[in-house]
Amino acid sequence: MTAEDVRWQQRLANYQRARVQLQAAVDLQSGRPLSDLEQQGLIQAFEFTHELAWNVMKDYFVYQGQSDIAGSRDATRAAFAVQLIEDGEGWMEMITSRNQSSHTYNRATAEAIMQRVTRQYAALFAKFEQRMVALQTKAAEGLGGVDG
């Protein structure tokens, strides 16, 4: 087993932990309004989870022998092409939200991003996790990757 074999799986484990934290914030928001600090935490959890998601994609492609992924857009396009993700447009919107959240702080922008996280992105993250866990299981059973 090479470092690439293990790396994507280690990154997936980190992604899973981050996604659980994001989901906890989403669940909290569904029960009551969040304080300003909690809102910031939800957005930061989204940013962190997104960063780990595209890095899982990138590391998985390296494991598959494809090392030309340069950033989140490349990773997202490649992941959609091989059905690691289903909603390519939703993931591209997620990149836009991620960029908006990290480069500006505007209450209206933050609230719009929080709505997208709770209504769309959290579910996309969960579906991606399910797909990658299934591939991890196949890899452990020696059945290969996306095509295996």
Regions found by a protein language model. Give the residues of each.
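Solvent-exposed interaction patches of small proteins and small membrane subunits
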Residues: 1-148
